[in-house]
Amino acid sequence: PLDSYECHHGIGYSRFLSSKNGLKADLLAFVPVNSTCEINKLTLTNTTDAPKTFSLFSYAEFCLWNAVDDSTNFQRNLSIGEVEIEGSTIYHKTEYRERRRHYSFFSVNSPVDGFDTSRDVFLGMNNGNAFPAAVKENKAGNSVASGWYPIASHQINITLSAGESKDFIFILGYSENPQDQKFVAPNVIRKDGAHKIPVSYTHLR
């Protein structure tokens, strides 16, 4: 269990504070006005008098664009998941080539030490969200989903000096492209919209 936990909900935002073994986490979550994304700003603080080294894992599971169909049509859905990875951003592009012009993405403003896009690899077979295999082993699988359950997870290895804090900004976003401008190369989606969104929030403090 955590050593402490607080949850605050305000107008247009939620904030979650927790601590464990001298590590404090402060998560601010909100959806900006007139933007197709959710911002999660995480501040980690070492409250001890000694350096602390640990790994941070993010996690988001993508839907396949139709909630009812996602939960029923498994013989089809489990064969269509598709992703791209570019730096610290994971793109979900299921059915983008065939019949869609929109995609979603999950990014972080930091270099990553690993990633996963397959839920089975990240969680482990027949495992749940309580203790994912990647977290247990402290090692992401660098999996690239092809079908099954596409997710986005980043691994970031961190060392904080005594009293040091570090901010991470995670963005879960959505973007669309004109029908005739969907790709920049074979099987490489146009990412202009996704590239613009993080730039708008580099000022967050």
Residue ranges of model-derived segments:
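Trp/Gly-enriched beta-strand surface patches
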Residues: 1, 6-24, 76-162
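Acidic, contiguous internal or C-terminal segments within carbohydrate-active enzymes
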Residues: 20-64, 159
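A short, sequence-level motif marking secondary-structure junctions
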Residues: 30-33, 97-98, 110-111, 174
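Short Pro-Gly-centered flexible turn/kink motifs
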Residues: 52, 158-176
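An exposed, glycine/acidic-rich loop-and-rim segment of catalytic or binding clefts
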Residues: 55-91
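Short glycine/proline/serine/threonine-rich loop/turn segments at secondary-structure transition edges
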Residues: 178-180
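Conserved small/polar residues in nucleotide/adenosyl-binding loops
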Residues: 202-203
